[in-house]
Swiss-Prot record:
Function: Plant-specific actin binding protein that bundles and stabilizes microfilaments (MFs). Has no nucleation or capping activity. Regulates MF reorganization during stomatal closure. The binding to F-actin is insensitive to Ca(2+) and pH. Binds weakly to inositol phosphates.
Effect noted on mutating F81A: Loss of actin-binding activity
Reported effect, V138D: Loss of dimerization and loss of actin-binding activity
Lineage: Eukaryota, Viridiplantae, Streptophyta, Embryophyta, Tracheophyta
Reported impact of V74A: Loss of actin-binding activity
Name of the protein described by the UniProt record: Stomatal closure-related actin-binding protein 1
Keyword Cytoplasm among UniProt keywords: yes
Comment field on protein domains: The NT5 region (73-100) is required for actin-binding activity.
Known outcome of mutating R75E: Loss of actin-binding activity
Protein family: Belongs to the SCAB family.
Length: 496
């Protein structure tokens, strides 16, 4: 039997942790944290500014895990589940080994305690105390071992639970992979079928396009051949013949209209001669828009027109309202769009006598002018080539070409890239035909852009002059502005 000596206690005291004095003061209430770096170097956590708090570390790792989970496919998840299942099985094996080792430790502790118990009965004195202290330590180790076994049992249960969970997850992942694979195959098949249908539709469309193209080409060739045949049969073409006939009819109509006006004037003269009224002057000219009306003497005894005072008026067809035309004081007056459908009068004062002349009928509109203006309205902005004859009352000798721009919101007069005048439609703006007489009165208009700035502008033809007036008044009316001449009454300012 082995003899226990007093050195057993001394060895226990040497192996024990020496006591800490009560007078010791620690700098912190917890054990300091350290970090082991490369080459087993120890770093203090407080001295490292790059070390993050536990909350930040958890947040960063959580974000990384979320990103990684988003990137992982179903196959990768299944692979990781299988790895986790293998790890769980390995942990289960390690738990079994730990359990066997724990049983061996219990047997050893029991044998050691029995040996110490038998030894306690054989020794006395100080050795007995040492044996009892050793028995207490063995019992404490047994308690710690029991606690450790409990913890191992709990860990074993958790490992089993985790293993079953991972196994179920692995099966679910495999099932999900199979379902996704089947779904992907079905999608691929449907996509192939759709592509095949599209290809077939494209082939049919190409075939139909080729067939229709050939048919269209044949029809076009037939039309070209028919057109060539008609062209060969009609020399000159019927269109040119119709144009010549239409032009001749217009000339005949104009001559008959002029002859009709002459007959009406002769009839009026006959009536006045029967009433013992001798006509000294008369209004000569075509009573239509685009012409010039002139006051001319009817006899050689008539006073010279330069010594007479003349004033032109416009009135309704029944003569109830008579409106003075401001500035129309010459023997020549060119009707403007305001005069269409009205009767024009000329009051003449000579040698203390007063004479009033009037047109035989109402002023007729110009043929085709309305449709021409409607076509210009659809363009929104129209430019006319003009020549400026007067600027603010002074004669302008230059005959250079200017551009008269009539827009939806404003009127502009330009010479090349230089803007001479540009004004929006307003109540201060005036626009009408020229009222000062002259041989080209039917082709000229008067435009007052604003107070103190006015122009007399000559157009290339009577049609363009009247179209510009009607177009500007149309756009101004859309802006709630009435464009008229000087001292014209606004209630009559309606374009025909």
């Amino acid at each position: 039997m082995t003899r226990v000596t007093r050195d057993f206690r001394d060895s226990l005291q040497r192996d024990g942790v020496p006591a800490v004095s009560a007078d010791v003061k620690f700098a912190s209430s917890r054990f300091p944290n350290y970090r082991i770096g490369a080459n087993d170097q120890i770093f203090d956590v407080k001295d490292d500014p790059k070390v993050m708090s536990m909350k930040e570390v958890v947040a960063r790792e959580t974000a990384q895990l979320m990103d990684q989970q988003k990137r992982l496919s179903v196959r990768d998840l299944a692979h990781k589940f299988e790895k986790g299942l293998a790890a769980a099985a390995k942990l289960s094996e390690e738990a079994k080994l730990k359990e066997a080792t724990s049983l061996e430790k219990h047997v050893l502790l029991k044998k050691l305690r029995d040996a110490l118990e038998s030894l306690r009965g054989r020794v006395a004195g100080r050795n007995k105390d040492d044996v009892e202290e050793a028995i207490a330590m063995v019992e404490a180790l047994a308690v710690q071992l029991t606690q450790r076994e409990g913890e191992l049992f709990i860990e074993k249960a958790e490992v089993k639970k985790l293993a079953s969970f991972l196994k179920q997850a692995s099966e679910d992942a495999k099932k999900l992979v199979d379902e996704e694979r089947a779904f992907a195959r079905a999608e691929i098949e449907s996509a192939r079928a759709a592509v095949q249908r599209v290809e077939e539709a494209l082939r049919e469309h190409e075939q139909m396009s080729r067939a229709s193209g050939k048919q269209d080409m044949e029809d076009l060739m037939k039309e070209v051949q028919e057109a060539r045949r008609i062209k060969m049969l009609h020399q000159p073409s019927r269109v040119m013949d119709m144009e010549y006939e239409l032009r001749a009819l217009r000339n005949q109509l104009a001559e008959k209209s002029k002859h009709f006006l002459q007959l009406q004037k002769k009839l009026a003269m006959c009536r006045k001669s029967e009433e013992n009224i001798s006509l000294v002057y008369e209004i000569d000219g075509t009573e239509a828009l685009g012409s010039c009306l002139r006051v001319r003497p009817c006899s050689n005894d008539a006073p010279d027109l330069s010594k007479c005072t003349i004033q032109w008026y416009r009135s309704s067809s029944d003569g109830s309202k008579k409106e003075l035309i401001s500035g129309a004081t010459k023997s020549v007056y060119a009707p403007e769009p305001f005069d269409v459908g009205r009767v024009l009068h000329a009051d003449i004062i000579y040698d203390g006598h007063s004479l009033s002349l009037s047109t035989v009928g109402k002023i007729d509109p110009a043929a085709g002018l309305g449709s021409y203006v409607e076509a210009l309205v659809r363009k929104h902005d129209v430019d006319f080539n003009v020549v400026v004859t007067q600027m603010s009352g002074e004669d302008h000798t230059s005959e250079s070409i200017h551009l008269f721009h009539v827009g939806k919101m404003r009127i502009k007069l330009c010479k090349g890239k230089t803007v001479i005048a540009k004004e929006y439609y307003s109540s201060a703006m005036q626009l009408c035909g020229v009222r000062g007489g002259g041989n080209a009165a039917a082709q000229a208009l008067y435009w007052q852009a604003k107070k103190g700035v006015s122009f007399v502008i000559a157009f290339e033809s009577e049609r363009e002059r009247n179209a510009a007036i009607m177009l500007a008044r149309r756009f101004a009316c859309d802006c709630n502005v009435t464009l008229a001449g000087p001292e014209d009454r606004t209630e009559t300012g309606q374009s025909p």
